[in-house]
């Protein structure tokens, strides 16, 4: 319903990096609503034990001027108590280093502590989370997963990333979930750890199987069935799974210190390596940017994955110019489709274009090469034809298939 309102311009949104939410630019916070699995009074203070996600709950509790309401949701098991590490970063000038050197190193408390007077009410509920089960893996996502695994192994062999300390971050969605599953199945990828914003079904399975040694996350995005399985088998995860506030799960300082390799999902990529990860056609929000910018800018290796086409081949995921840009070419190291890997490191703009066209769908490679050839007549470090940069998007809007593009309609001189 919220997504429909955003697409219809009935609701406005400011999409910001998740690690920047506490700067106060959104104005004063009047009330807070916090979901909890338990509340305990200890030595005159209330301890709020959270459920399957933390987000910005600690900051909301601290800044809410009139107080907070607690939604005590008994659907969530109190067995999850002890799986949270709640720590707030100090304000600048007094900010100490965030001393996390391992993915599940504990530096905070397993609860939020507030004064009883700050809690204005407790509402009892018994409601499961609304997350849906992930779509099953396809031939495309399995191929992307295998290419990603091969790319990681090659980087380890070259010494570009650490083989004995592989720490991954994974984006959200069925595609990212399937890629993580494929990495877990690869015999060449060593056991690894995860430091990420959101954990989905496949990483949870890999934790239980011992393939993932440790996982730190800001939230669990699991279907009610998978979340109930977690609660029923909590001992399989305890000591290997930790939930953190979003400003810690997405903290640039920690991402850089741990040498995280990020794996995020792209909606579209242009031939020079810019990535659109949020808006379909540049206008319709698919999802927020979340912490993907934090990870992409600070990761040791920043990779994006996507199928080469969408809508039964009528849309190419590789385009001359992105209709919206979330991640610039300066931070994107590699793109993976079912046709291979485009390693963009140490490449000029035109070398990046050749590498990306090589992993586009075969139907679109001649179209993209023709654009690059025509744009070459205009010269420059980066070759573009401003009147034709969005020709594929416009052709899909008018004709329903990017493959029907006619460059002559857009290039008049």
Task: Please place each PLM-identified region on the residue numbering.
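N-terminal active-site beta-alpha-beta segment that forms phosphate/nucleotide-binding
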Residues: 136-231
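His/Asp/Glu-rich metal-coordinating catalytic cores
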Residues: 49-55, 70, 75-114
């Amino acid at each position: 319903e919220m997504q429909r309102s955003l697409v219809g311009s009935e609701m406005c949104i400011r999409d910001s990096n998740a690690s920047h939410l506490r700067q106060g630019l959104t104005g004063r916070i009047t009330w807070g609503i916090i979901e909890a699995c338990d509340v305990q009074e200890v030595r005159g203070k209330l301890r709020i034990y959270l459920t399957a996600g933390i987000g910005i709950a600690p900051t909301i509790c601290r800044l809410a001027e009139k107080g907070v309401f607690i939604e005590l949701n008994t659907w969530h098991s109190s067995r999850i108590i002890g799986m949270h590490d709640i720590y707030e970063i100090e304000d600048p000038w007094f900010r100490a280093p965030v001393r996390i050197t391992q993915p599940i190193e504990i530096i905070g408390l397993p609860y939020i502590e507030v004064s009883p007077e700050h809690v204005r009410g407790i509402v009892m509920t018994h409601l499961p989370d609304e997350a849906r089960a992930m779509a099953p893996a396809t031939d495309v996502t399995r191929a992307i997963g295998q290419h990603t695994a091969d790319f990681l192994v090659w980087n380890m062999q070259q010494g570009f990333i650490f083989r004995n300390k592989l720490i991954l971050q994974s984006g959200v969605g069925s595609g990212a979930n399937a890629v993580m599953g494929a990495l877990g199945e690869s015999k060449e990828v060593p056991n690894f750890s995860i430091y990420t914003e959101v954990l989905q079904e496949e990483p949870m399975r890999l934790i239980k199987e011992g393939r993932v040694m440790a996982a730190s996350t800001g939230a669990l995005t699991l279907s009610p069935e998978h979340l109930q399985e977690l609660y029923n088998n909590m001992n399989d995860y305890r000591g290997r799974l930790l939930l953190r506030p979003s400003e810690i799960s997405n903290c640039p300082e920690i991402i850089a210190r741990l040498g995280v390799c990020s794996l995020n999902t792209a909606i579209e990529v242009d031939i020079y390596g810019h990535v659109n990860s949020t808006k379909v056609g540049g206008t319709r929000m698919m999802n927020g940017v979340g912490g993907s910018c934090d990870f992409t800018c600070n990761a040791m290796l920043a990779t994006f994955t996507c199928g080469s086409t969408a809508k039964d081949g009528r849309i190419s995921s590789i385009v001359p110019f992105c209709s919206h840009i979330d991640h610039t070419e300066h931070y994107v190291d590699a793109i993976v489709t079912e046709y291979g890997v485009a390693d963009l490191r140490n490449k000029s703009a035109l070398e990046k274009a050749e590498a990306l066209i090589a992993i586009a769908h075969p139907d679109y490679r001649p179209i993209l090469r023709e654009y690059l050839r025509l744009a070459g007549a205009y010269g420059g470090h980066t070759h573009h034809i401003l009147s034709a940069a969005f020709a594929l998007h416009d052709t899909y809007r008018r004709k329903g298939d990017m493959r029907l593009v006619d460059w002559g309609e857009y290039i008049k001189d």
